[in-house]
Design a protein with these regions (language model features):
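Sec/Tat signal peptide C-region and signal peptidase I cleavage site
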Residues: 20-26
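Hydrophobic/aromatic-rich core segments of domains that either
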Residues: 122-186
Length: 195
């Protein structure tokens, strides 16, 4: 009787373990990815459930502080550009969008980059994965007469301080870590093309 009872408990325990809910899989996502300068072209980028689970892990690794979250958003942007680059043929996007290569569909200007990064950040925000920031509107600096070419960037706003931070993925090449700094510092940069 003891053996039969043990066997029954083991079988019952195994059934409970197998029927226990696993971690909820993340819903897939689809976003529009701009390229070809001025969002002239766009490619649909699809993120599978596995992709979204990986992205959540990258972003949530930064939940300990605002600084850690910005670092995690930089890593998430790199991850995003690798996937989007493969899907859109822009994985060879050069630093500063191959400045001067206006008709090259594999390159992105700062308008493409700021729209893409903002769209991506809004996806993260909509999923509820941001602890310390909200997504801001894209910002611009320069207007030629101040010796700076016009340049756009994505932004996030730190919840605790209200300070705006840029996540500028146009400066580096595809899938390299973006420039992340306070908006007030970014606004002063870019004179004569220097960053």
């Amino acid at each position: 009787m003891k053996i039969s009872m043990r066997r029954t408990l083991c079988v019952f325990g195994a059934m409970v373990a197998l029927s226990a809910p696993s971690a909820a899989a993340e819903e897939p996502a689809v976003i529009r990815y701009c390229h070809g300068f001025g969002c002239k072209l766009s490619t649909t980028v699809r993120f599978s459930s596995v992709d979204m689970t990986e992205l959540k892990s990258i972003v949530r690794a930064g939940r300990s502080s605002a600084e850690a979250e910005r670092e995690a958003l930089g890593r998430a942007d790199q991850w995003y550009e690798r996937l989007a680059g493969a899907a859109s043929g822009t994985s060879t996007d050069k630093a500063k969008g191959g400045f001067g290569e206006v008709y090259d569909a594999s390159q992105l200007d700062c308008i493409d980059e700021s729209r893409n990064t903002t769209t991506f950040l809004k996806l993260i925000e909509k999923r509820g994965w941001l602890s310390h920031h909200t997504v801001g509107k894209p910002k611009v600096r320069g207007f030629i007469l101040d010796l700076r070419y016009p340049h756009n960037t994505a932004t996030v706003i730190e919840k605790e301080t209200g300070e705006a931070w840029v996540i500028d993925s146009w400066i580096p090449a595809n899938a390299e870590f973006p420039d992340i700094m306070p908006l007030k510092i970014w606004k002063k940069k870019g004179v004569l093309g220097r960053n």
